[in-house]
Amino acid sequence: GGLLMWYKVNRLIAAIRGVPAGVSLPSPPTHQTKYSIEEAVAKMTQSMYMAWGFRVPVYPKISATSTAMAVLNNLTRNPYAAGLAIDGEDGGTGAAYNVSMNHMGHPIASNIRDGYLNLVKLGMQNQVPIFAGGGIGKNGNLAANTAALIMLGASGVQVGKYIMQAAAGCLGSENDRCNICNIGLCPKGITSQDPRLYRRLDAEKVAQRVVDLYLSFDTELKKIVAPLGRSTSLPIGMSDALGIDDPNIAKRLKIKYVV
């Protein structure tokens, strides 16, 4: 979920959502009868599973915070939950205020590591997959970031902003981004509801670029994990293959400190 800024709530969106135009919309809406993590997680997973007729796996997605482990612990006892997706502090979205995007959340690496080690203690590391997101590949090193997170315990990664930049031509960057995706004026038409803007986006070309990007990413990832003897399976939790030259980070993530 997030916040659909009032700039984007035009007549069409307002009609679909049944609200006045020009009003910011929290998404999803709050459940006033749920006052604990346990109740919220149970409601979320059960409702989604019921909506899909119990045929599609459901992966709740949460922000990387101090409560992420509490959510994960509840998922280990929830028969409806198939896994957990965690979005770190570097994640970018067009559905939030800048203060939310730039100054909230925990680093994804520490949350993923804590979650995996917690699952190991419970003997459930192969039963409840964790997916990492948030700024992965933001410096053009998607495969390397992915490999590191997998070795820390992630079962996979989710990528959004990097795909928009590499495949859809997003003009934003970490150092000089345009900062207007959240107000509906994206010059590439990616995050705009204005027909004069979104018609600039060639969806077919972007779709092909996405395919090409993931095929290239798959090749690069195999180049990294193959020397570890994992050419056909992911080295989930193989932290002995990781090292870092910062003793504090090494201690926090429980990986090797190398000079």
Per-region residue spans from a language model:
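Glycine-rich phosphate/ribose-binding loops and adjacent secondary-structure elements
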Residues: 26-201, 205
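C-terminal extensions of enzymes
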Residues: 201-259
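Glycine-centered secondary-structure boundary/capping sites
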Residues: 18, 105-106, 123, 153, ...
